[in-house]
Each structure stands twice: as C-alpha cells, then as structure tokens.
Amino acid sequence: MSPHTEGPLFAVLKNSRARPRPRESRLRRRVHKQMNISPTPKRYNSRGYEFPRSNDEAFHPFNREPPMVPSERILPEEYRVNSQMINKLIKQNKDLTQQLDRKQDEIDRLNVLVGSLRGKLIKYTELNKKLEQAAAGARQSSPDDVLQVNRTRPREPPAGGTRLDDRLSDLYSKLETLTELVVGSAAADRGARDHVHVPSAGATRTPSSGASVSHRPLQPGAASEDDILTQESAELKGLEDQIDLLKRKLLIKRENELRKLSLNKELLDLMEKLDVSRPAGPVPSSSTPPHCDQCHKAAYQTAAANGGHGVPAGAGSGAGAGASMPSPRNPPYMSMAQVLETPTPAHRSSHKPNDTLW
C-alpha cells in the first residue's frame, strides 16, 4: 500500500467514525440500480443525502494527521558507535559505583576499629600515668623504718653522725655498767658462799664480751652508708634486747631473795612455836657453816643462862649471825626442813655502784 492510501481517511475508517467517499457511494448506487437492489443510504450517511466534501470534518486540513514515519531507517555508523560507548560507560560507571560502595563499607569498619583502639589507648595511657604517679608517691613517702633510710650518699660524713656516735657511746657505757653490776653481784654471792675472793670465769668473760661488743669497729669504707646505718640499727636493737634481758634477770633475782628471806623468817617462827626439846640446828644457808655439836651446846648454854626458850642465840638474830661459828665437815643429822630450805642470799656490800638505768 502506498503512503497516500494511509491518510486521514484510513484513520477515520479505522476508528469507525468516518463515512465512505462520495465516489464509492455513487458507484454502489449504480450497482444497486442495475441489480435492482434497494439502496441503504443510512449505512453511509445519517441524513440520507450527499453533502459536499468541503463541509466534511474528516477532510479539514486541521484534522489531518501527518504522514507516518517508516519504522525502519538506515542510521549512520556514528550513532551505533556512540550508543555502544555510552553503554560501556554506563556499565563501567555501575562497576565503579559498586566498588566505591565496597570501599566505603571497608572504611566504615576500619573507622569503628580505629575508634575502639583509640579508646583503649587512652584508657591504658591513663592507667600507666596513675601507676607511675603511685610508684613515685610510694618512693617519695616511704614509711619510717629503723632499717630503711633515704638513699642520700654524700661524700662528706653527715652532721648527725656525731650525735649517733654519742648515743652509741652512752648505750655502751650503760651496758658496761649493767654488766659490771651483774658480774659484781654474782662474784659477791660466790665469794660469800666459798669465802674465796676470786673472780669467776664468767665474770672475766662478760666484760671482755661487752667490750668487744662496745668497741666493735665499723668500716665505713667497706660498705655503703645504708649498710652502715642498717648494721648500727641492728646492733642497737641487740643491745636493747640484752638490757631488757638483764633487767628481767635482776628483777627475778631480787624477788627470789625477798622470797628466801620471808621463808627463812617464817621457818624460824615455826621452830620457835614448836618449842622442841631437842635443839634444832641452825638454818643452813650459803653464809652459815654446817652443824657443830660443840658450838651448838655452847650456844644453848649461853641461851639458857640468858633465860631463852631453847632457841639458839644466832637463830633469832637472822641468818647471818651464824657466820662466826666454826664449820665441821659432817653434820650428825639433817631435818626435812633443812632439806627443803634454800640457801640464804649473801649480804651485799654497802658500797653499791651507781645504777643509771632505774
């Protein structure tokens, strides 16, 4: 079909709203007349008569459609190349967009990891600072201890060294005085018991040991100042312990002496109350000699002459009155009271050394 047949009339007929052409209607009427067929004018027009073409709206120039463009045309090669390049660029753009999205996701994950690591770094840095400050504070304010001093090592001896030496010398002198007192009391006891004024071996050893302790040399050049102060502190502690021990020993000894005296007095009182017919010997002690028959008879004769009650003359005056009696070797008998009795302590000399400790 030619392009002229596909005009506005064809479109009107296709829409079933246009009327057939007048020429065709005339031809059909002729055919109907020849064939003796009644015409059907309503099929072609509503009014039943022919109207001019100029009045037909279908043929109006404003109602005509433009001629249809053929569907297939030969395009230039540049169009095809351009379309291919555009398609390639679009695909490449999509790939780059996807790759960029993946990289952005990876960057987000790395940012989260960096944030967590930064927080941990800040936390551990603060903890490290706190620990360093605590360590510095502990080093600066260390607790006072006898064996711990500041780590100052001056080349010249400190000014407080003389005061420390004075204190040491005072402690050593007090220790020597106390040692001599203890040794003198022990020597007096042994001398009164044995009637021999010979210093014992312990008495000779104790001052030497005290002197060795008191005059033990310190070697400041061989060790550091901390070691020297530590050694001196240990020595002072040992001396204080020795002094406390000697004090306790002296106190126990004095208590024992007082107890012995009270027991001896109580025993003498009991013997006086018994008023036994047989005369009892004197109470044995460290300062009285053993029993003697002759001396005992003489003492009782003197007591009878003076009007006594059978008690020896030396028994009433204390345990030290029997020191002038002669001492026989073997006593004839020994009572149970004499067996259980402890020796009486010796009399101390009136010249007592000055005790500076108490």
From Swiss-Prot:
It is found in: Nucleus; Cytoplasm, Cytoskeleton, Microtubule organizing center, Spindle pole body. One of its GO terms (cellular component) is spindle pole body. Residues 1-43, 135-166, 189-226, 310-358 are annotated as: Disordered. Signal peptide: none annotated. Its main location: nucleus. Keywords: Coiled coil, Cytoplasm, Cytoskeleton, Nucleus. Residues 16-33 have a biased composition (Basic residues). Residues 82-140, 226-275 form a coiled coil. Residues 310-321 have a biased composition (Gly residues). Residues 203-212 have a biased composition (Polar residues). Belongs to the SPC42 family. Forms a polymeric layer at the periphery of the spindle pole body (SPB) central plaque which has an essential function during SPB duplication and may facilitate attachment of the SPB to the nuclear membrane. This is Spindle pole body component SPC42. The lineage of its organism: Eukaryota, Fungi, Dikarya, Ascomycota, Saccharomycotina. The gene is SPC42.
